[in-house]
Amino acid sequence: MNKIKTVTVVGANGTMGANVSAIFASFGSATVYMVARDKEKSKKAAIRAGKSVKADSIVNHLIPVDYSNLDECVKASDLVFESAAENLELKIDLHTKIGRSLKKGAVACTGSSGLSITRLAECYPEEVRSQFFGVHMFNPPYQLTLCELTASPYSDMALYADLKAYLTDTLFRTVAESKDLPAFLGNRIGFYVMNEALQYAERYQDNGGIDYIDALLGPFTGRTMPPITTADFVGLDVHKAIVDNIYENTNDYVHEKFVLPAYVQKLIDQKKLGRKSGEGLYKLIKNDSGDKRMMVYDIKLGIYRDEIKYTFPFALRMKKYLR
């Protein structure tokens, strides 16, 4: 594999796109073309990227561009990383365009967290199809080093080995080699847990619902971020795309655990997508004095209410015995 000096990140204005751009620029010391729908969004993403790795100096390595520059950026790049929304048709369109300009020996990859790598590889002309891989970095990548690497049946396995070495030795990723199955490895497990928690919140809405389930499945199970809070952090639109993909393309004993609850779809329809949109399953309110107040969506009433700090008898007994 050629030395990775120039990288293009497609969809760089998104949270993950900006964060991944920062990883390539900081750890990889690469020049990164940040491709977004418009240049102003790309410029703002470059600033966020610097902050995500606590290194404003990398902004000098980040070049904001828009999609009108995609062809020339891809031609100049040693690696092209697509980080667009988790939508198969959108990704097919983008990879078809990338494939027209990808140079021989360069690497193309998708940051998809679970869509078919084989299907996306088929967007590329035969002469460069072997250069395409799945590289799913976990969010936020500066703090979570886990990275899923996935080949397609068309992949050049020598190039795959070189890419794995680059991810490990240069970008300091902890690489998990994954099969090309819906949601790969991490999200097949993680989104099963999150979606089941959302289902339980609906089932136990009379007990409190969302924050009730999070209180049970958070610290008591060793999680620093409870599962429903995690879904809010990921984005409800992304959550839906992943669980819908798993539901449509699998049929195992946990199939029904990937059915999206109706109240989550309702929030998505209202553009309440979670932390990135300012409200979703949770909503943080700031008053004029700067004090913060966490609200939670009440499934039964369809409104936001104050988050409840639950106490559970088993937790009180545990504290008693631990003293």
Predicted regions and their residues:
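N-terminal glycine-rich phosphate-binding loop for ADP-containing cofactors
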Residues: 1-323
